[in-house]
């Protein structure tokens, strides 16, 4: 699973 850009920092 890849975090979307809204979860920047993960």
Curated annotation (Swiss-Prot):
On the 2D-gel the determined pI of this unknown protein is: 8.3, its MW is: 30 kDa. This is Unknown protein from spot P5 of 2D-PAGE of heart tissue. It comes from Rattus norvegicus.
